[in-house]
Amino acid sequence: MTVPGVAPALSQTCDALQAGPSGRVVSISDGDTFDLDTGLTVRLVGIQAPKLPLGRDGFEAWPLGDEAKATIEDLVMGQQVSLYYGGESRDRHGRALAHVMVERDGEVVWVQAEMLRLGLARVYSFPDNRSCLEVLYAAEAQGRADRLGIWRDPYYAIRDGGDHEALLDRTGGYELVEGRVLNAERVGSRVYLNFGRVWREDFTAVIESQGLRVFEQAGIDPLVFDNA
């Protein structure tokens, strides 16, 4: 199928999705999760919005979490939405992992792309759910170029892979990290990308076997990043 974009700049097509169920949105948890009147909980696959505590002890809300939730409410609350699947359709909690379309003012809006374009989410993919990433990254790039939402907040800044002390302070979070890989090494079923000389102390990215299959399908050997 052809997925409509949310603006002319995002008019690329994505032919990998299959139509799923539809329903009316009756409650919203945060900027990427809501419930339908059918009882199905939907997790917007392919993106991650700023997180809220949602009853978790000691969990601090991420900046712009309330704004992301308010935007989703404005987009879909009380509206009939259509779900589309491009990979694994359920997570371990039983939530639908779906791309979501909603009609607004006579036009179909792709909710994930809209949140990215507004700078209220980042692309967030898994090996078993990578459909439409090119279009999603284009939407994210637009939000970043316009410095909207999270892209003007230091909390979401792209981290330096060589600054291991700063990264240590971000343990447990989801970060975008860039830098030079000083060493790439395969050990068993994993590949380690080391951004420092002392792997026990410096930042290291680990590619598990499932992720390595994605690299293989793309024709990329991650070992080429050695000293790159």
Place the predicted regions along the sequence by residue.
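Small beta-barrel nucleic-acid-binding modules, primarily SNase/OB-fold domains
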Residues: 5-228
